[in-house]
UniProtKB/Swiss-Prot annotation:
Pfam families: DHBP_synthase
Description of how the protein assembles with itself and partners: Homodimer.
Upper taxonomic lineage: Bacteria, Pseudomonadati, Pseudomonadota, Gammaproteobacteria, Pasteurellales
Bound cofactor: record note: Binds 2 divalent metal cations per subunit. Magnesium or manganese.
Residues given in the record as Mg(2+) 1 binding sites: E38
Native species: Pasteurella multocida (strain Pm70)
Essential for catalytic activity (site feature) positions: H136, E174
Keyword set, alphabetical order: Lyase, Magnesium, Manganese, Metal-binding, Riboflavin biosynthesis
GO CC terms: cytosol
Enzyme Commission code: 4.1.99.12
Protein name per Swiss-Prot or TrEMBL: 3,4-dihydroxy-2-butanone 4-phosphate synthase
Metabolic or biological pathway, per its Swiss-Prot or TrEMBL entry: Cofactor biosynthesis; riboflavin biosynthesis; 2-hydroxy-3-oxobutyl phosphate from D-ribulose 5-phosphate: step 1/1
Catalytic function, reaction form: D-ribulose 5-phosphate = (2S)-2-hydroxy-3-oxobutyl phosphate + formate + H(+)
Residues reported in the UniProt entry to bind Mg(2+) 2: E38, H153
Purpose: Catalyzes the conversion of D-ribulose 5-phosphate to formate and 3,4-dihydroxy-2-butanone 4-phosphate.
């Protein structure tokens, strides 16, 4: 990653701390992965505090595929099996079956309905029967060990939530440009400065976790 483009957001550790602090306040963070991986930026919010306004932003500026990243423990609690028996995707993105809240939603597509579904999934004592399958929220199972084991947005979102004191659950969506193409680092920086989001790389989070053993 070209560090100079990220200089407005500080050095690596400063970016990691700013991202964790933003999460603690229920605010969003833009996370960039490695250039030789997806080379994309995701807007991520803590699942426990997601609002309709934040969901609307994800839908408006993102790819439309809003994902709920969950620890393996939560996936087991909710009985969310893998979407497929054999995962042949390039980055082994661990989609589970899709979900909808069993109560309180209409079609499940609106920002309000999607927030209702996420709240049902991350509620205290949530159980499998609280969710219908399939639905319009795409859960992703994070690898145990987080970004230290897999340098993906899924693991980054769960790590950020955990480091901020939340349940291991984050809501993510890839940011796209106006022409529908994927936003890369330069566009992510512009987007972040326009809306006031911190930017952090997965490399930053790996370094922070390794330094502080967290």
């Amino acid at each position: 990653m070209n560090q100079s483009i990220l200089s407005p957001f500080g050095q690596s550790e400063e970016r990691a701390i700013a991202a964790i602090n933003a999460f603690k306040q229920g605010n969003g963070v833009l996370v960039l992965d490695d250039e030789d991986r997806e080379n994309e930026g995701d807007l991520i919010f803590p699942a426990e505090t997601i609002t309709v306004e934040q969901m609307t932003m994800l839908i408006r500026y993102g790819s439309g595929i809003v994902c709920l990243c969950l620890s393996d423990e939560i996936c087991q609690q909710l009985d969310l099996p893998p979407m497929v028996t054999e995962n042949t995707s390039v980055n082994k993105t661990a989609f589970t079956v899709t979900i909808e809240a069993a109560k309180g939603v209409s079609t499940g597509v609106s920002a309000t309905d999607r927030v209702t579904t996420i709240r049902a999934a991350v509620a205290d004592n949530a159980k499998p029967s609280d969710l219908s399958r399939p639905g319009h929220i795409f859960p992703l199972r994070a690898m145990t060990g987080g970004v230290l084991k897999r340098r993906g947005h899924t693991e980054a979102s769960v790590d950020l939530a955990r480091l901020a004191g939340y349940k291991a659950a984050g809501v993510i969506c890839e940011i796209t440009n106006d022409d529908g193409s994927m936003a890369r680092a330069p566009e992510i920086v512009t987007f972040a400065q326009k809306f006031g989001f911190p930017v952090v790389t997965i490399e930053d989070l790996v370094a922070y976790r390794q330094k502080y053993d967290v």
